[in-house]
Design a protein with these regions (language model features):
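Low-complexity, Ser/Thr/Pro/Gly-enriched N-terminal "stalk/linker" regions
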Residues: 16, 23-33, 40-44, 48-200, ...
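The feature captures the catalytic groove of carbohydrate-active enzymes
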Residues: 113-139, 192-201, 243-264, 271, ...
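Structural helix-adjacent loops and short alpha-helical linkers that scaffold large soluble proteins
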Residues: 162-171, 215-227, 272-293, 339-359, ...
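Long, well-ordered core segments of solenoidal/helical folds
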Residues: 174-189, 219-241, 287-308, 355-373, ...
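Aromatic-rich carbohydrate-recognition surfaces in CAZymes
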Residues: 200-303, 328, 332, 485-504
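C-terminal capping/lid segments that line or modulate ligand- or cofactor-binding pockets
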Residues: 255-272, 380-400, 438-514
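Extended ligand-binding clefts on enzyme/binding-domain cores
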Residues: 256-259, 322-333, 344-345, 351-440, ...
Length: 514
């Protein structure tokens, strides 16, 4: 573990239901906690390491920890005491589209958003909002004209695109998810994973999903802005850092790069291109094409003799000893996407090169992963992985054996609370907490493989776990309560994509090359 020296953990107890966040200040993570050490800037190489334990049991106060000196920006309503030494992950957001401020769980419990906005109606009836051009919230009388104008602009933005959903409940969830993603999007195109301090970084993976969700709901400018940020932060060798600071100045720590970004970013670009205005999309693709070429060439060059990529940290941000499906599947999607974009850009040599690489990778996946039911790794030692869903549309055309693998994986990862653990690797103890992104993957996969009823049931479970403000949280605890940071951009984007996929013609998938 880079930059981490033996030491001690600082853990305090807060009366915050369902929150467990161990954070390493200078040592190894303790066992038994499912919190978010990796998302804090502690030098730990894994996004999820230290999060895999059983969590708090028995309904008592949850252990909650922050790095020494860690400050927050959560704004309490007047009359609500703010914890002096620690803050909980956010439960919501105030936003003026250029700035954001987190809403504390204690405040969120008695407040509600004014519909279609990030203006908060407090228990007192007054409004709390983030004034334009400001970084601190204000509490004003209901109907305050500047706050009202902000509400009107927010609703106009929603109306400029579309809000997917076949029911009132689904549309309400989609609306809130879209607003949350807009609030987490920075003017430079960076997407904060969440708005608690440890989540205020931009992950290429999360950002790619958000870009695709914006593209498929008619918000072209936002989708393209995210892709522009990806182009600006791409490394010289064609890869990306695991995460960057929101100002684009670089990574906050020395964790290893993750090769899956070389699949996710071309895939997101391809999804944007399908929905972009035809009159301008080729010219705008030309601006992004150097990014695509570097990403796809690096991905193709990384493939070994067996057609698979090398071992790399997967979406768990944990390194495996052998190739994993969480890297191989996104790279296949990205190579197919890049090849199709090359054909659109009249670059036939690029298209042929990346198509050949995609065929090699597809053959390697069929040879090594298919016999194992698309388990996490090719050595068969690390169990089932929710990343099996990345082999399904809208990422890849469903290969042989995938339907059974999806069913088996879902069944083996299902928790008593109705959600999924990310995987059942014997070396990764996730405990009783379900992860909403991992669960929502299956809604998207089943929607894309012609099983809308199964997709709908899973999606409705995820949407039913929104918190009091209607935000989607990162986790759901063993008692079925939303837990950890909310809103989470990644979960929101997957939910929106699944809702789109369940409507009309569904979502497109990058084609296999000719």
């Amino acid at each position: 573990m880079r930059g981490v020296r033996p030491g001690r953990w600082v853990v305090v107890t807060a009366a915050l239901a369902s929150v467990a966040v161990p954070v390493c200040t200078s040592g190894h993570p303790p066992t038994g906690h499912p919190g978010h050490a990796a998302r804090y800037d502690t030098g730990h190489p894994s996004r999820y390491a230290g999060q895999r334990g059983g969590g708090q049991r028995g309904g008592g106060p949850a252990p909650f920890a922050l790095p020494v000196g860690h400050g927050g920006r959560l704004a309490p309503e007047p009359g609500h005491a703010r914890p002096a030494a620690l803050e909980a992950p956010t439960a919501g957001l105030l936003s003026n589209t250029t700035g954001a401020e987190g809403v504390a769980p204690a405040l969120a419990a008695d407040a509600r958003y004014v519909q279609g906005s990030h203006v908060l109606r407090l228990a007192s009836g007054r409004w709390m909002y983030l004034p334009d051009g400001k970084t601190a919230s204000a509490v004003v009388v209901a109907g305050h004209p500047p706050a009202r104008r902000q509400i009107e602009r927010s609703r106009a933005w929603l109306a400029s695109g579309r809000v997917p959903g076949t029911s009132t409940e689904r549309r309400a969830a989609a609306e809130r998810a879209l607003l949350a993603m807009r609030a987490l999007l920075r003017p430079n195109g960076a997407v904060a994973a969440g708005w608690s301090d440890g989540w205020k970084y931009s992950w290429p993976r999360d950002s790619s999903f958000v870009s695709a969700a914006f593209a498929h709901t008619g918000h072209d400018a936002e989708a393209y802005r995210i892709l522009g940020y990806s182009a600006a932060t791409q490394r010289a060798d064609g890869t990306w850092e695991a995460r960057t600071k929101l100002d684009g100045s670089g990574p906050p720590d020395a964790r290893s790069a993750q090769l899956d970004a070389n699949g996710w970013v071309p895939w997101a670009t391809w999804q944007w291109y399908q929905e972009a205005p035809p009159a301008t999309r080729r010219a705008r693709l030309a601006t992004l094409y150097p990014m695509i070429r570097k990403a796809a060439d690096h991905a193709a060059a990384s493939l070994r003799a067996d057609g698979l990529p090398p071992a790399s940290p997967d979406y768990w941000e944990l390194t495996t000893a052998t190739a994993n499906i969480g890297t191989a599947a996104p790279l296949l999607a990205g190579l197919n996407a890049a090849a199709d974009l090359a054909r659109e850009a009249n670059r036939p040599q690029d298209a042929d090169r990346w198509t050949r690489a995609a065929r090699r990778l597809s053959a390697g996946i069929s040879t090594r992963f298919l016999p194992l039911g698309y388990q996490r790794t090719v050595d068969g030692r690390h169990g089932r992985d929710s990343a099996v869903a990345f082999m399904a549309p809208p990422f890849n055309e469903a290969p042989s054996g995938l339907a059974g693998a999806l069913d088996t994986t879902y069944r083996e990862l299902l928790l008593p609370n109705g959600g999924l653990t990310p995987g059942n690797d014997p070396g990764a103890r996730w405990g009783a907490y379900a992860w909403t992104p991992s669960t929502a993957f299956f809604a998207l996969a089943w929607a894309g493989t012609g099983r809308p009823e199964k997709a709908g049931r899973v999606l409705d479970w995820v949407l039913s776990k929104r918190n009091a403000l209607g935000e989607l949280s990162e986790k759901v605890d063993g008692k079925g309560r939303p837990s950890s940071v909310a809103p989470l951009a990644w979960t929101g984007s997957i939910a929106v994509l699944a809702l789109v996929a369940l409507e009309g013609t569904g979502l497109p998938t990058p084609p296999l090359g000719p």
